[in-house]
Amino acid sequence: MDFLELEAIEGLRWSWNSWPTTKSDCESLVVPLSIMYTPLMHFSELPTIPYDPLICSRCGAVLNPYARVDYQSRIWSCPFCFHKNLFPRSYSGITETNLPAELFPTYSAVEYSPLPSRQSGSNTTTPTAAASWSNGFNQGVRSMPSNSSFSSLASSTVGGGGGVISELGPAFVFVVDASMVEDELRAVRSDVLFVIEQLPENCLVALITFDSMVRVYDLGFSECSKVVVFHGERDLSPDQIQQFLGLGYSKQFHHGKMSAIRKQSFLLPLVECEFNLTSAFEEIIPLVDVKPGHRPHRSTGAAISTALGLLEGCSVTTGSRIMVFTSGPATRGPGIIVDSDLSNSIRTHRDIITGHVSYYDKSCGFYKKLAKRLCDSSVVLDVFACSLDQVGAAELRYAVEMSGGFLLLGETFESEQFKKCLRHIFIRDADGNLSMYFDVSLEVVTTKDMRICGALGPVVSLRQKNDIVSETEIGEGGTYMWKTSTVTNKTCVSFFFHVSNEQNRKPQPGSAFFIQFITRYRYGNGAMRKRVTTVARRWVAGKSPEISSSFDQETAASVMARLAINRAEECHARDVITWLDNGLIRFASRFGDYIQEDPSSFRLTPNFSLYPQFMFYLRRSQFLDVFNNSPDETGFFRLMLNREGVVNSIIMIQPTLLRYSFDGPPVPVLLDIRSVTPDVILLFDSYFYVVIHHGSKIAQWRKLEYHKDPSHETFRNLLEAPEIDAAQLVTDRIPMPRIVRCDQHGSQARFLLAKLNPSVTQKTDHTGGSDIVLTDDMSLQDFLEDLQSLAVKG
């Protein structure tokens, strides 16, 4: 079974699928012991279990197929800590031939979605009824208390998705930049109102607009438009925001008794305020009196902080999103990016490196504090930024990433890219529920011989320690539990481990070790669910050939890319590239076959041979080589790499290239300048954009409109084939990549040429029909020759 087939079963990719038994042997691997985990990956077969999981009373692991079961005594032994646990009475029918789904050996992952029963006046979780199991068991059904903070709609029901479903849906706060030009504002209004019309009526909604001021709309006031206005310059605390909005409890006497009633009309169920919300959107007037030579006043940071303060004050626990629509940088208040005076240019990478930035560090600090509040309250921050200029995504990135939100950098809100991204967020499942996952927590349980170092991805450490947490931290470390506000079916987190040999004890080669991932989340219908993935691998001796055969070079490259961009946040890019190079030399020296001091003898086996190539393209990728990108673009690229799985990460690191010609069907070709020839069409996929490149002869024939001649049907089919394939490539990606169409020697061809291996340059002998690249960059062949020379040194 190959690594992709294993991922389809487990939702995991391992850099090494067999682990050495000692810490020193693990360190000699160079590539760390790591697992890329997609918590809510879509499986073709995922058993849904309608009751709560059984938990080991000692280590907290969930009952799984690796547990040893004594059917006579109804006892199960935890494979992680070996503690013996009693089965409850509801498992009385368990036998070797009558197993619950969580013990089926074929299920690496199961999902618990308890069917609750309501018990009036009770806030405890107790068995109250019996649900029939598909395999003949009866399991107690448990009730869960309603958690709505809105007393008028606090009751709960049972829905088809399982779990307790609050009558209140998720909350959405729409934060709109009122400094947009009229056409852009019209496009935002049209698309946002479209998705609002599709929302379930129990969803909570609010509207905030901002320019130099921040306006919070009172959606419960119908006589006229009523807003609470905040000055955009002020950085208010959550308590101050809530005080000015009048959030909290008012005391009233009813039949001689004092009662507390929540009074607010800024965040209301859609069914109560849809007309007022639509009217408020229609009344937003674009700013027209911008001073010549100045940027519009935008208080973006104050608006986001106000939206979060509103959600915090309303104690929303059903999941919530702050959705920001902006067309320029913040020019005042907390989170400011640049002064409004156009004589002050927006910061570049060089400005950040040299420290010539007025606001960058302070604004990053503001958004990092905001990120903690977002995660503490399980609020998602989505930013849709459409502008020809930078908008401050580099500063905003941390808050968006740590909350799991979407970041879109586009040119105009009238684009199909924006429409598709916005509507994708609000898609529904077969039962009509929003396909959203809120309030997500991740927990890792391991056997005693390993330690958890940390995680890299859109998660925040909860700083919960136990015996399996390492003192060495990588990324978000110092914990066995992490949190984020939301994930998607594609969100992927990289976890790092090391082997612990305390008191000189080490596991026996050939024995198994276990890792369990427990993901808790709230579905779009309000139901709480828990997905449990339990997997096993084997310990091997340090020099065992199983180590080499277990190496997954695609996962290793993805992991090293995340480590590299994590380092790049603190170090200069040149230092990060040096770190990558030194690691690659040690890796090649460790796993290459060679005669010492003889570079020509160097060989790598097939399961290692692609790894140096991945590192070559990573060093010259947009993640580390930021020369041609703005800080906003770099922040976006790194955010996407830090959340995508192995397959998409590899496309980002080493893009794919397909050749279309009259000789036959499309074929993959080398990512090399020699692949550019006049008589072919190339389809280039870098994940962030897709290029359809016509060779000079193809472009000439197209301009002569040969494809419109019925006698040249083959040529027409040749032109259509890459267009169809490009459309399929971008279909499932959010945000949708840009499709660039260009001709050989045209200006847009730079999107392709910049990513190709410069095997033919102005310094090399040039023969044949391929292009040349004007560059001083090292080619892949020179890179590999240097690697071989350094790897074979004593």
Swiss-Prot record:
- Tell me which Gene Ontology terms the entry assigns under biological process: COPII-coated vesicle budding; intracellular protein transport
Protein name as it appears in the record:
Protein transport protein SEC23 G
What residues does Zn(2+) bind to?
56, 59, 78, 81
Coiled-coil annotated residue ranges, if any: none
Q: Which GO terms describe its cellular component?
A: COPII vesicle coat; endoplasmic reticulum membrane
| InterPro entries membership | ADF-H/Gelsolin-like_dom_sf (IPR029006), Gelsolin-like_dom (IPR007123), Gelsolin-like_dom_sf (IPR036180), Sec23 (IPR037364), Sec23/24_helical_dom (IPR006900), Sec23/24_helical_dom_sf (IPR036175), Sec23/24_trunk_dom (IPR006896), Sec23_24_beta_S (IPR012990)
**Bilayer topology:** Peripheral membrane protein
